[in-house]
């Protein structure tokens, strides 16, 4: 394979979601690099109607007339030959969702680079943004690494940090990190062969886990601070919720913590007050003031409106269970 000797690189891009799509768009519109192909996940059934839907990255690639590859397995000879025949210099991976085998990475003279939304080695794994919010981190950032055959362990090429605000959700924090990572990716690709000096990651790694819908269930035995962090971390997905009588599921979109010094007279899970400020619930430590909620099939509304929706349970003194 002949390496492209110009500043303009021949790239294979791998990604799936909106975060990935925005990076692909930046590479196409703000650089002279040529995208020879896009690897993305197979179309999947989404929504209540289970309609087969293409990834946002695929939709953009199709619009830009870039060849799209959607392998169900990445270790087949067919997929290998498809990528090999593109004769690309490098593969760039941004929120693809699958592990790229070393066999595929070896195709590219410049190897592969990955954009990760944390300051590695902190929060390796699939949910670094949510993990930073759940942990109450005050600082996070993005890291661009040289890919190897392990997950998020490659040498660091570039990193940039940003402050986490107390009001940040996963979506607002991701938007801030997207700006940093797009800028960083463009910078890294300039004179790629001679412009960076990789740094080996330290051994002080922490790990994030795959998120499931059940993770977003509000457990009143936790502290108000823990619950408020969860509400921000799981926005916009899977959205925190609690259940009434183990049936009615109420989504919680926003909340804040009230420091309360006379908590002993309330039970954990008890609704203390519902007013224009929200619905206040006793937790294991302090009060969680829920401000915006969503009933099944309804629009997001202020928690005070629950009193106007004929919900007999929605009165002070009601004890919400953890089941």
UniProtKB/Swiss-Prot annotation:
Taxonomic superkingdom: Bacteria
UniProt keyword annotation of Ribosomal protein present: no
Protein encoded by which gene: fmt
EC primary class: transferase
Family (UniProt): Belongs to the Fmt family.
InterPro entries (alphabetical): Fmt (IPR005794), Formyl_trans_C (IPR005793), Formyl_trans_C_sf (IPR037022), Formyl_transf_N (IPR002376), Formyl_transf_N_sf (IPR036477), Formyl_transferase-like_C_sf (IPR011034), Met-tRNA-FMT_C (IPR044135), Met-tRNA-FMT_N (IPR041711)
GO terms for MF: methionyl-tRNA formyltransferase activity
Chain's role: Attaches a formyl group to the free amino group of methionyl-tRNA(fMet). The formyl group appears to play a dual role in the initiator identity of N-formylmethionyl-tRNA by promoting its recognition by IF2 and preventing the misappropriation of this tRNA by the elongation apparatus.
Catalytic activity from the UniProt record: L-methionyl-tRNA(fMet) + (6R)-10-formyltetrahydrofolate = N-formyl-L-methionyl-tRNA(fMet) + (6S)-5,6,7,8-tetrahydrofolate + H(+)
UniProt keyword Transferase present: yes
A GO cellular component entry from the record: cytosol
Cleavable signal peptide: none
Pfam families, per database record: Formyl_trans_C (PF02911), Formyl_trans_N (PF00551)
Biological source species: Buchnera aphidicola subsp. Baizongia pistaciae (strain Bp)
Enzyme Commission code: 2.1.2.9
This protein's name: Methionyl-tRNA formyltransferase
Binding locations of (6S)-5,6,7,8-tetrahydrofolate: 118-121
Keywords from the named record: Protein biosynthesis, Transferase
């Amino acid at each position: 394979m002949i390496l492209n000797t110009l500043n303009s690189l021949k790239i294979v891009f791998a990604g799936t979601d909106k975060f990935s799509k925005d990076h692909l768009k930046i590479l196409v519109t703000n650089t002279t690099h040529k995208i020879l192909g896009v690897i993305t996940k197979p179309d999947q059934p989404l929504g209540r109607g289970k309609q087969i839907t293409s990834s946002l990255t695929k939709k953009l690639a199709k619009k830009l007339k870039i060849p799209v590859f959607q392998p169900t397995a990445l270790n087949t000879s067919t997929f290998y030959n498809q990528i090999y025949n593109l004769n690309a210099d490098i593969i760039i991976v941004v929120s693809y969702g699958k592990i790229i085998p070393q066999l595929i990475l070896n195709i590219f003279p410049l190897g592969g680079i990955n954009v990760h939304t944390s300051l590695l080695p902190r929060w390796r794994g699939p949910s670094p943004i949510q993990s930073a919010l759940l942990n109450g981190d005050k600082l996070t950032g993005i890291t661009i690494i040289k890919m190897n055959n392990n997950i998020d362990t490659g040498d660091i090429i570039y990193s940039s940090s940003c402050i986490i605000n107390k009001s940040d959700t996963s979506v607002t924090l991701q938007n801030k990190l997207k700006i940093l990572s797009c800028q960083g990716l463009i910078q890294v690709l300039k004179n790629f062969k001679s412009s960076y000096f990789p740094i080996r990651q330290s051994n002080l790694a922490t790990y994030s886990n795959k998120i499931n819908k059940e993770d977003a269930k509000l457990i009143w035995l936790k502290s108000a601070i823990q619950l408020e962090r969860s509400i921000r971390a799981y926005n916009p997905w899977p959205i925190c919720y609690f259940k009434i009588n183990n049936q009615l599921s109420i989504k919680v979109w926003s909340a804040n913590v009230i420091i309360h010094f006379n908590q002993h007279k309330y039970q954990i899970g008890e609704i203390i007050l519902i007013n224009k400020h929200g619905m206040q619930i006793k937790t294991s430590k302090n009060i969680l003031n829920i401000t915006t909620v969503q009933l099944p099939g309804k629009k997001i509304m202020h928690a005070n409106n629950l009193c106007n929706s004929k919900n007999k349970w929605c009165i002070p003194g009601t004890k919400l269970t953890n089941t």
